[in-house]
C-alpha cells in the first residue's frame, strides 16, 4: 500500500512539473509575440552593454535580441547566463571570432553561442520536417547560407493553412511574426526554461 501511495505521489508531482513546463512555454510564446514591432531597426553593430541585464537601444536589434527580450520578461537574463557558462567552458563554445575570452557585450547576441548554450543548458530537440514537432515557445535556428545563421521563437499563431506555427524573429524587417519555419535549413531546435 505504501508503495502505491509513493507511486501516485510521484505521478502527481511529475505531472505538475510537466504542466508547469508546458505553461511556461505557452507564456514564453505569448511574451515573444508581444514583442512585435516592425519599426525595430536591424542593427548588428557592437555595443557596450550594462551587465547584467544589458540590452541594445530599444528601437534596435537583431534576431538574437528577440529571444533575449522574450526571456527577460521572465527575469531570465541570457546575457548573464551565457557569459557565466562561457567563462567556465569557453573552449566548448564556437571560436569563430578570434577571441580568447568571453565578451559580455556580444556573446549572447551571436546565434552560434546561443545554440551552444541551449544545447548545454536546455533541451536539444530533433530537426524535423514535420510541423507537429515544433511547439509554441520552442527556439529554432536556421542556416541562411553564406555563413549567416538566424534564430526565432515559435508562437501560438498558425499559418494560413493551419499546418504550422509561425515564428517571431528579426531578419531585417523589424520584430515580426512570419511563416518561415521551413523557409531555410533548420540547424537547431531547442526548449529552454526554468
Regions picked out by a protein language model, each given a short descriptive name:
Residues 18-61:
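Active-site-adjacent structural segments surrounding the nucleophilic cysteine of cysteine proteases
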Residues 33, 37, 68-76, 83, ...:
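Sec-exported extracytoplasmic/periplasmic mature domains
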Residues 44-64, 77-101:
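Acidic helix-start/capping segments at beta-turn-to-alpha-helix junctions
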Residues 164-194:
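Low-complexity, Gly/Ser/Thr/Pro-rich intrinsically disordered linker/tail segments
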Amino acid at each position: 500500500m505504501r508503495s502505491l501511495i509513493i507511486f501516485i505521489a510521484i505521478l502527481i508531482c511529475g505531472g505538475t512539473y510537466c504542466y508547469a513546463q508546458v505553461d511556461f512555454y505557452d507564456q514564453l510564446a505569448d511574451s515573444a509575440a508581444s514583442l512585435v514591432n516592425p519599426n525595430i531597426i536591424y542593427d548588428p553593430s557592437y555595443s557596450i552593454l550594462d551587465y547584467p541585464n544589458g540590452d541594445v537601444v530599444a528601437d534596435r536589434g537583431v534576431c538574437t535580441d528577440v529571444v533575449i527580450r522574450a526571456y527577460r520578461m521572465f527575469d531570465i537574463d541570457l546575457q548573464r547566463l551565457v557569459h557565466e557558462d562561457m567563462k567556465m567552458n569557453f573552449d566548448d563554445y564556437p571560436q569563430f571570432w578570434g577571441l580568447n575570452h568571453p565578451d559580455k557585450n556580444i556573446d549572447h547576441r551571436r546565434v552560434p553561442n546561443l545554440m551552444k548554450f541551449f544545447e548545454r543548458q536546455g533541451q536539444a530537440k530533433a530537426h524535423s520536417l514535420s510541423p507537429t514537432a515544433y511547439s509554441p515557445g520552442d527556439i529554432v535556428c536556421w542556416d541562411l547560407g553564406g555563413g549567416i545563421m538566424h534564430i526565432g521563437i515559435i508562437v501560438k499563431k498558425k499559418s494560413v493553412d493551419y499546418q504550422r506555427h509561425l515564428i517571431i524573429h528579426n531578419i531585417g524587417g523589424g520584430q515580426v511574426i512570419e511563416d518561415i519555419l521551413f523557409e531555410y535549413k533548420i540547424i537547431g531546435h531547442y526548449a529552454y526554461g526554468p
